[in-house]
Amino acid sequence: MKIDKQKEKEFMDSKFNFSYSSMNRLLFSPRIFYKEYILKEREVKMDKHLVEGRVIHTLLLQPDDFDSMFTVLPSKIPSDAVRRVLNDLKKYDNPNMSELDDEILEALQYHNLYQSFKDDSKRLAKIQTSENAQYFHFLLESKKDIIDQDTLDRCKNRVEMLKDNKDIMSLFTHEVTDFEMDNLEVYNEKMLDCNLVKYKFGLKGIVDRYVIDHETKTITIIDLKTSGKSITDFPETVDFYKYWLQAAIYIILVGKNVSEEIAQTYKISFKFVVIDKYDQTYAFNVSSNTLNQWTDNLHKLLEIVNFHYTECKYNLPYEFMVKEVTL
């Protein structure tokens, strides 16, 4: 494991707020967390399903921001594997891929792509295509996410399916007016952060949507998920990907970003809105008992996070560091 004491010091000297993804990464593999968040050697995630998820979120929750966040490519987007190679080539700042033979071959070897070919020229031919060249040009020139028209059309269709579900759209159609007695506060894609009394680190996250209803004294938090499985598998997915951890973090974030009176007296509810691989849509309610259990579990995990953070120990997951694990 590569160690850098100077970067460790810089990390500890700056206030770090854990997001769902960074906390999940630390719990899964402290070594990967160290590489990505302390050494800052984090690879940009360019997988197609992740990009499509962001497009759907934007079209539904922030449609006016779409043009500032995405560039639509006239031709087809390369595969995820090829895009990772092209992304590696960005650092050379050379738009002419024909002048990057050695760099392309090195990137292909690193990503173990087209290594079954015997001839380097065949490997290069797979990358140095007109379609890839066009994508690479956009990659160098644009700071936005790049999608193609097929992706945009597919995402628009999925958003329309969500809108066709009246039960789901009732969660996304609260209207706020300028009337000073308006009882609703609505927030979409809201970046929140907070300090934690017991710890030197804090929490942060972008909450898809939450609605504060001052008439009913309720706060409804809504998280939109695009799933590669069926909605029938979503309860297991919540455990597998620790979506419950994300929900618990969001509850704390929202609770700490409202007044103390609201935090103490308003009831918080949480809903997962899911569109699955078959374009089935459903809003999963989370019971109060389940939310309380998730929040309790988060507080237990914060002790583990605190151990790694304060002791600066990232060699192994917590349970392997504090006791012997027996099979």
Map each language-model feature to its residues.
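Metal-dependent nuclease catalytic cores that hydrolyze phosphodiester bonds in DNA/RNA
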Residues: M1-K204
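Short acidic (Asp/Glu) and glycine-rich catalytic loops that position anionic groups and cofactors
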Residues: Y34-Y37, T226-S230, Y278-Q280
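Glycine- and acidic
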Residues: K40-R42, S230-E236, A283
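Single, functionally critical "micro-switch" positions that shape active/binding sites
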Residues: I56, V207, Y250
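Hydrophobic/aromatic-lined pockets within catalytic cores
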Residues: L60-D65, L196, V211, T226-K229, ...
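Metal-dependent nuclease catalytic regions and adjoining charged, substrate-binding loops involved
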Residues: D93-E106, V159, E236-W244, I249-L327
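Short regulatory "switch" loops immediately downstream of catalytic or recognition motifs
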Residues: E160-L171, I212-H214, I252-E260
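Non-catalytic protein-protein interaction segments used by genome-maintenance enzymes to assemble
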Residues: M181, E185-W244
